[in-house]
Amino acid sequence: MEMMEKEFPDIRTIRLDRNYGFTGGYDRGLEAVDADCFILLNTDVEVPSDWLGPVLRTMENCPEVGACAPKIMSWYDRDSFEYAGAAGGYIDSLGFPFCRGRVLGMIEKDNGQYDNAADVMWASGACLAVRSSLFRRLGGLDDRFFAHMEEIDFCWRLQLEGYAVRIVPQYRVWHIGGGTLPQTSPRKLQLNYRNNLLMLQNNLARTFAIELCKAGKNTAEAAGRACRKARRRILLRMTVDGIAAAAYLLKGSAASFMAVVRAHSEFRELGRWPSRQDVQAFAEAHSDSEVKGIMPGSIILKALVHGRRIFEKLNSLCR
C-alpha cells in the first residue's frame, strides 16, 4: 500500500482493517466503488496497455453478458495457457473444474485454437470484468469461501440469473499464480475441496430444478426432485473425495489427507442446504435461465481415456 500511495498518488486506495481473503476483500472494497463495471484484477497479473478496450466494448454492446474475461496466459511460459483460467472454464458433473487450454495437468500452447468469443461456465477471477449492478444483486462473492473457486461459484450464480460468461479472445494477460497460497500448500488443498462442496450446495439444486421444469415437471415436483438429486450428487462427490484422501495417505502425504478431512468438516459447519420452497420459488422466477458449460460424466475418466486428444473434444463434451 505504501508503494502504491507513493508511486501512484492519483490512484484511490481503500484500506481494510485485516485480511478478509479474496472474497471478503473484494466484497468490502467494491462497496466503496461507484462504476458501471467492476474489474477484478490480481496483483500478480501483467496486462498489455490496450487490454481494457475489448472488455468494455463487450460489456457495452452485449447486454446478455454479465461477466467477461481475457485469455489467461502463464507468466512463466508466455505462450502457454495458465492453469487456473486459460481460455475459460467448465466443470464436470461432480464439480471438478477444467478449462479450454487446461485439463488436469495437461496445458496447451496458445496457437489460436480458442480465438473465438465463447460463452463458458466460468472465467478466472484473476482478471474478470463484471457488471456492478449484477455483482451487487448477487451479493458479491460468497464470503464463506475466503479464496479459491469463488469465481466459479459466482459465475454459476450469474448464469442462473440468466446472464452469460464470455471469453473475449482479442486480448491476453499473463498471470504468475500462487500468490495467495503455493500449489503445495495443504491449506490450498483444503480450501479447494471445501469450496467445491459449498459451490455445489449453492447451485446444484436450483440448476436441476430449472432443467426439470424445462423437461415438463411442475415447479413443486421439480424442486423436490432437484433437492434430493443435489444431495445425492454431493454425497457422491464426498465419496470421491474420500477415495482421494485415502490415496494421499497411501502415498505418505498425511498433510494432504488431513486437508480433505478438514475440508469436509468445515463444509458441514459452513454449509447451508437450500429449502425445497426456496428452490421452487427460484425455478418459478428463472424458468428461462440456462447454465452452460457443465460436462456430463467425469473429466478425470475422459482425460484418462483420450489423453491430450481431450482438447479436441471439449466443445462437443460440454453443453
PLM regions: where:
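Acidic donor-binding segment of Leloir-type glycosyltransferases
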Residues: 1-15
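Glycine-rich, basic loop-to-helix element that forms the pyrophosphate-binding segment
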Residues: 15-33, 43-45, 54
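Short aromatic/hydrophobic "clamp" motif used to bind/position activated sugar donors
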Residues: 38
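Short, flexible, basic/aromatic active-site loop/helix in glycosyltransferases
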Residues: 89-120
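Conserved donor NDP-sugar-binding/catalytic core segment of glycosyltransferases
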Residues: 46-96
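A short, conserved alpha-helix in the catalytic core of glycosyltransferases
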Residues: 115-172
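Active-site-adjacent helix/loop segment of glycosyltransferases
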Residues: 161-280, 298
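Short alpha-helix within the catalytic core of nucleotide-sugar-dependent glycosyltransferases
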Residues: 1-2, 27, 35, 49-60, ...
